[in-house]
């Protein structure tokens, strides 16, 4: 009886060790198929087969030792590229197609990433997407900065990109907030209008006033230059033929931007 029990215990012990070895081997195999990449400070963990999906590309070259790549302090491959945009590069490798969130506006930057990683398919899809966007007519939107008591005082900004109008509106609010301790009720915002309680005229031009004690926020000229600089940085063109009727953009009551 004891002999049979001991034999069973030995068999169970052997099976347990065998299973442990199998689990350990599976764990090693799993780890060996994974890679951690540090792209511009962002860590991505993916399978090697994902990175080698397309031959003769930058990532395939790293995995197969064709391309030498530096390591970060933790021993991960370091690639000095845009860490946020790499998410879309990796999703392209996983899905075999370009899937971008609604409102994505960084086509040119993503095209540069595709070129760096030598992904011709991704580059072609980005180019195709950008060309379709250029052909799609955009509805002109506007932002009005106005005096509550005198609608003739103020500035209108017209643009064919609604998201850019939102950027300008946020920037104007930020500029105004930075010059005030609080955010007064006299400053009201709607979908397309920023309305101040009073404007005043001074030797230096029209100023935006939010309080009865004439708290200075900024001049309309300052806001015009803010809008123009933002537009140029975002790749818009200023339609000067529309805006220079008064001799100078600074004296114009409307700015028109187009892409």
Curated annotation (Swiss-Prot):
Pfam families hit by this protein: BTB_2, KCTD4_C
SUPFAM superfamilies per record: POZ domain (SSF54695)
Start and end residues of each BTB domain: 33-134
Chain residue ranges for the region called Disordered: 1-22
GO biological process: protein homooligomerization
UniProt cross-references to InterPro entries, sorted A to Z: BTB/POZ_dom, KCTD4_C, SKP1/BTB/POZ_sf, T1-type_BTB
Membrane-spanning intervals of the chain: none
This protein's name: BTB/POZ domain-containing protein KCTD4
Source species of the chain: Bos taurus (Bovine)
Gene: KCTD4
């Amino acid at each position: 009886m004891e002999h049979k029990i001991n034999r069973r215990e030995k068999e169970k012990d052997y099976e347990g060790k065998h299973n442990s070895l199998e689990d350990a081997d599976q764990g090693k195999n799993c780890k060996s198929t994974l890679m951690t990449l540090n792209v511009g400070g962002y860590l991505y963990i993916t399978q090697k087969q994902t990175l080698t999906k397309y031959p003769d590309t930058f990532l395939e070259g790293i995995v197969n030792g064709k391309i030498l790549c530096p390591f970060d302090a933790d021993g991960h491959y370091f690639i000095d590229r845009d860490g946020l945009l790499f998410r879309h590069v990796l999703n392209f490798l996983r899905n075999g197609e370009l899937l971008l969130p609604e409102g994505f506006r960084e086509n040119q930057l993503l095209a540069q990433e595709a070129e760096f990683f030598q992904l011709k398919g991704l580059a072609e899809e980005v180019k195709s997407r950008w060309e379709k966007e250029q052909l799609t007519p955009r509805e002109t939107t506007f932002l009005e900065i106005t005096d509550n008591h005198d609608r003739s005082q103020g500035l209108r900004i017209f643009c064919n990109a609604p998201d850019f109008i939102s950027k300008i509106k946020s920037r104007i609010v930020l500029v105004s907030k930075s010059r005030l301790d609080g955010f007064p009720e006299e400053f009201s915002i709607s979908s397309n209008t920023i309305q101040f309680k009073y404007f005043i005229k001074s030797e230096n031009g029209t100023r935006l006033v939010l309080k009865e004690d004439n708290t200075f926020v900024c001049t309309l000229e300052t806001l015009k230059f803010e809008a123009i600089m933002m537009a140029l940085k975002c790749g818009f063109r200023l339609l000067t033929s529309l805006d220079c009727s008064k001799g100078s953009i600074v004296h114009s009551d409307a700015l028109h931007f187009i892409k």
